[in-house]
Amino acid sequence: MKKLLLLLVCGMIFTGCGAEQTVETVADEPVVQVLAEPREIYVALPDDSVLPAMESDSGTVYFCKDYDISIQTMESGDLRKTVKSVSGYSPEELTVMETAVSDYVRYDFVWSAAGELGQQVCRACVLDDGNYHYALAVMGNADTAGEYGEIWSGILESFCLV
């Protein structure tokens, strides 16, 4: 009787010890990370800018007299990828200035490159709110860029999240 009682107690102890195996099936739906909606941006466009010349879900290009303005929205996370996408250069090849603004971070940088119409000068700004990168780039011919320095500064300084 003692043996039977001992076997019964041991059986009760060891029956709950097996680890439950988790099995994933084809019908399981993957967990998708949902990003917040992109925020609204504000930029003071100059009077000589025409209506958007090209527009897509992620960006807009405006043509002005001697320069172009492009605005893009990209997923946040990889600043290196965003800077490379905007400028064609990695952040290590540029001087990227970081400024903390109330609820986002601002990155400013400048570069020049040879274009079809000669040497091009470009200034850009990327705003990072943690969910998206909002990029503004102003580019024009190096010969006439000096004439528009004040206008370009005004455009870039006005670029912010609302």
Go through the PLM ranges and name each one.
Residues A53-T144:
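Conserved polar/disulfide-associated segments of primarily extracytoplasmic proteins
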Residues L5-T60, Y67, G130-Y132, M139-V162:
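N-terminal targeting sequences that direct proteins away from the cytosol to non-cytosolic compartments
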